Amino acid sequence: MNTSVYDKLQKVLDDRNVEGYLGLIHDDAQIIFHKSGDRFNKSEWVSVVGGMMRNPKFVKDASRCIYEDSDMLVSDTFMSYPGDTKEAVMLVCMLKDGQIIRMETR
């Protein structure tokens, strides 16, 4: 049985495994932050996500998969951030060949 992209994503985030995380991101991926409007390609995203995963104050408190099929993943996560703020983050991903080709947070 194949492990879902959501389950793989949760595992690499829990383990703070940057290489494993980047393995889930398609080489042609676009990452978009709705709140700030920032956009990244995979090579730009590498340093951003690496810094987040190395910071112990960047914490995934709880997460649930709302929907996943071979083309799309939607999850809802409660996050804690370095500035002692907390947010609910909706993640919407388009999938291609088992990898994230487009990721947008809300």
Regions found by a protein language model. Give the residues of each.
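Short, solvent-exposed secondary-structure junction/capping segments
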Residues: 7-11, 23-37
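A beta-strand edge to alpha-helix "cap/lid" segment located at domain peripheries
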Residues: 32, 46-106
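Sparse recognition of residues in long alpha-helices and their boundaries
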Residues: 37-38, 61
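Short beta-edge strand/loop motif at the mouth of beta-sheet-based domains
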Residues: 39-44
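Generic helix N-cap/helix-start motif at coil->alpha-helix transitions
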Residues: 1-2
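Short helix-adjacent coil turns
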Residues: 16-20
